[in-house]
Regions:
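Short basic helix-loop element that most often maps to the first helix and adjoining turn
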Residues: 4-19, 76-78
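DNA major-groove recognition helix of helix-turn-helix/homeodomain DNA-binding modules
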Residues: 25, 42-60
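Recognition helix of helix-turn-helix/homeodomain-like DNA-binding domains
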Residues: 25-40
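Alpha-helical residues within the helix-turn-helix
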Residues: 11, 22, 36
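Helix-turn-helix/homeodomain-like alpha-helical modules used for DNA recognition
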Residues: 57-78
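Conserved hydrophobic/aromatic packing and binding residues within compact polymer-binding modules
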Residues: 6, 20-21, 31-34
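Short, conserved glycine- and acidic-residue-centered signature motifs
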Residues: 2, 13, 41-44
């Protein structure tokens, strides 16, 4: 997950920094730093990504990115 994908995912979910930080068991400063492009430990990024995926985000990376580059998509609501 790239920092911009984290920001896009939070925005799409209408999730605040504090809400994501609490759910991922990290500080709000950690989320802010990551979204600014600062490096985090891989396990911290994984924890944040897991919360976003469980909330319905699909990350578009690699072969799925196409011309537009990495992005996100929301799972269809049932």
């Amino acid at each position: 997950m790239l920092p911009i994908q984290c920001k896009m995912a939070r925005t799409a979910l209408e999730m605040g920094v504090k809400q994501l930080a609490d759910a991922a068991a990290v500080s709000t400063n950690t989320i802010v730093r990551f979204e600014r492009g600062e490096d985090l430990k891989p396990r911290t990024i994984a924890a944040i990504r897991t919360v976003l995926e469980e909330a319905g985000v699909i990350f578009l990376d690699g072969d799925y990115s196409g011309v537009g580059g990495p992005g996100i998509r929301l799972k269809a609501m049932e």
